[in-house]
Amino acid sequence: MIVAANLKCNHTRASFLNFTKKLDNFLSGEASNFKKNEILIFPPNTAFCDQISNFTQGAQNFFPCENGSFTGEIGADMLNEFGIKSVLIGHSERRVIFSESDRMVLEKFKFAKKRGWRIIFCVGESDIVRMNGNYREVLSDQLSEIDLDYENLIIAYEPIWAIGTGKSAKNEQIEEVLEFLAEKTEAPLLYGGSVNLKNISQISKLPHCSGVLIGSASWEAENFINLLKELQ
């Protein structure tokens, strides 16, 4: 079971260090059954920590470069300093808020694949697309250019209308989309979108579900630990 936490624009270096200590202690004790590569935490770039033992740290965003004249961006050299080899690509907040194009998403994918990084590739439809019923076409388009056979690929289904709204997709909706995605790739499939303490257990048991990508419910260490307890 893969459990990923997107901390988004939350946590300072000090607060994330405290987060990591609490989580490491939990994972080394009563939750030692979780493997390090099953728990992925994506802090903001300014909070990267080099004192992590029992989980994997990843990057929410990066620019497809080693280094260079790219003001405000972070490249592979910076990620390498912290041993980061897991990245989020294609998140709807990057696409919508920051106007990240399909071309840039593809460039990031190619860059990460070339380096053997573990990629959580996010796909999802808007509420309008969902109501119109053509979400399968939209999801197919989002996946059309990437290598679905890449060995370090994870696909996260995050319907845009469920992200940060407190309104998770219904189990039958999640199950249908995951089945559709499973026909396209053998990559592990995650669900993300208002995952919380009340629904995480049921979601994790759905067919084709290999785990979850959690947003706000994971931002505090105690809350994230309680979510992990639901999966034990």
Swiss-Prot record:
Subunit organization: Homodimer.
Enzyme class: isomerase
GO annotations of cellular component type: cytosol
GO biological process terms held by the UniProt record: gluconeogenesis; glyceraldehyde-3-phosphate biosynthetic process; glycerol catabolic process; glycolytic process
UniProt-listed HAMAP family: TIM_B (MF_00147_B)
Organism, as annotated: Campylobacter hominis (strain ATCC BAA-381 / DSM 21671 / CCUG 45161 / LMG 19568 / NCTC 13146 / CH001A)
Highest classification ranks of the organism: Bacteria, Pseudomonadati, Campylobacterota, Epsilonproteobacteria, Campylobacterales
Main location: cytoplasm
Keywords, ordered alphabetically: Cytoplasm, Gluconeogenesis, Glycolysis, Isomerase
Protein name: Triosephosphate isomerase
Pathway where it operates: Carbohydrate biosynthesis; gluconeogenesis; Carbohydrate degradation; glycolysis; D-glyceraldehyde 3-phosphate from glycerone phosphate: step 1/1
